[in-house]
């Protein structure tokens, strides 16, 4: 009988719990739900296993406060850290979450050095960089969840604007997972037709699309403002699951993620949101898009902002 993959979730809050539920529903593997808060992962694990029973799923879910339980994990998804609060930018979180990420990285290095690691903790581009440097894992096995989520928001708003199914919409959002992200209109399409062409046909306007771009950039903040006591968790979890599934099932999907660059886009030693192919080896290839001068300016502005934040932790 084939052994289930072992998937460890570091952090048992809203995103961690949602991840566990989705993994269980999709039967992707057995789950270790870790948290430093005693009782929280154990309680959620019990609740989730009872839910899985209704679905007829025999997936094992273990809640723990002991890092030793992640030993031998095939994949690790990290959500641990302070969440965003109203009025707080992702970047305000940097100092406290850097300390948390360093601790998580040391334990992954100790117990799960062969795992594929997905970081969700904000500020994302910095946290995934810290994970790589502190864990010593190969860069093709450490990525950040960014562009999948940003693109999903952009896709939704575009689908509403053009009154079509979200299945007809494809978009690419490059850059840092924050206010400087770059939704690329030329590479964003409705059933293969680029958005600029649809504007020329009179199906939308530059003004409306600019509003959608701004809303996409502030997508996380909009939800924080509405919730008042937390931040988005369903869509971030679903985004990470798409990445995890591409790895576990060797689907070789092209997904926009925070990936480590070593010369691609003329960028060295930095994590930034770019399209990548994810398969059983982890990051198989970074897709280098041909950018216009205007797109390059926006992209490198985003890169500069990420570099500035990394400088604050070194």
Curated annotation (Swiss-Prot):
According to its UniProt entry, the protein's GO biological process terms are: lactate metabolic process; tricarboxylic acid cycle
Active site positions: 177 (proton acceptor)
The catalytic activity of this protein is classed by the Enzyme Commission as 1.1.1.37
* Annotated organism of origin: Rickettsia prowazekii (strain Madrid E)
Entry-linked PANTHER family = L-2-HYDROXYCARBOXYLATE DEHYDROGENASE (NAD(P)(+)) (PTHR43128), L-LACTATE DEHYDROGENASE (PTHR43128:SF16)
Q: Briefly, what is this protein's role?
A: Catalyzes the reversible oxidation of malate to oxaloacetate.
Q: A Pfam family for this UniProt protein?
A: Ldh_1_C
Which keywords annotate this record?
A: NAD, Oxidoreductase, Tricarboxylic acid cycle
- Hey, which family's this protein in? Belongs to the LDH/MDH superfamily. MDH type 3 family.
The protein here is known as Malate dehydrogenase
Binding-site list for substrate: 84, 90, 122, 153
Which catalytic reaction applies to this protein? Answer: (S)-malate + NAD(+) = oxaloacetate + NADH + H(+)
- Its gene name is mdh
Q: Where does NAD(+) bind?
A: 11-16, 35, 97, 120-122
GO molecular-function annotation terms? Answer: L-lactate dehydrogenase activity; L-malate dehydrogenase (NAD+) activity
């Amino acid at each position: 009988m084939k052994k289930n993959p072992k998937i460890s979730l570091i952090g048992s809050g809203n995103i961690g719990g949602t991840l566990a539920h989705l993994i269980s529903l999709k039967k992707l593997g057995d789950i270790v739900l870790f948290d430093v808060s005693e009782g929280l992962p154990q309680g959620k694990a019990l609740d989730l296993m009872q839910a899985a029973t209704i679905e007829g799923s025999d997936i094992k879910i273990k809640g723990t406060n002991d890092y030793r339980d992640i030993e031998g994990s095939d994949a690790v998804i990290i959500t641990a850290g302070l969440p965003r609060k109203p009025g707080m930018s992702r970047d305000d979180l940097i100092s406290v979450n850097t300390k948390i990420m360093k601790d998580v990285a040391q334990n992954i290095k100790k117990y799960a050095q062969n795992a594929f690691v997905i970081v969700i903790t904000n500020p994302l581009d910095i946290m995934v960089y810290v994970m790589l440097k502190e864990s010593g894992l190969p860069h093709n096995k450490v990525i950040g969840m960014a562009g999948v989520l940003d693109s999903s928001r952009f896709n939704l708003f575009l689908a509403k604007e053009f009154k079509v199914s979200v299945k007809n919409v494809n978009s690419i959002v490059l850059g840092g997972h924050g206010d400087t992200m770059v939704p690329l209109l030329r590479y964003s399409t409705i059933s293969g037709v680029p958005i600029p062409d649809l504007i020329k046909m009179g199906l939308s306007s530059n003004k409306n699309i600019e509003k959608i771009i701004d809303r996409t950039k502030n997508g996380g903040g909009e939800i924080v403002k509405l919730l008042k006591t937390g931040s988005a968790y369903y869509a971030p979890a679903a985004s990470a699951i798409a990445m995890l599934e591409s790895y576990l099932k060797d689907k070789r999907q092209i997904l926009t993620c925070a990936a480590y660059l070593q010369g691609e886009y003329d960028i060295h030693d930095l994590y930034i949101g770019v399209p990548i192919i994810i398969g059983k080896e982890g990051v198989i290839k970074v897709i280098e898009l041909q950018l216009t001068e205007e797109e390059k300016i926006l992209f490198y502005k985003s890169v500069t902002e990420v570099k500035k934040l990394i400088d604050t932790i070194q």
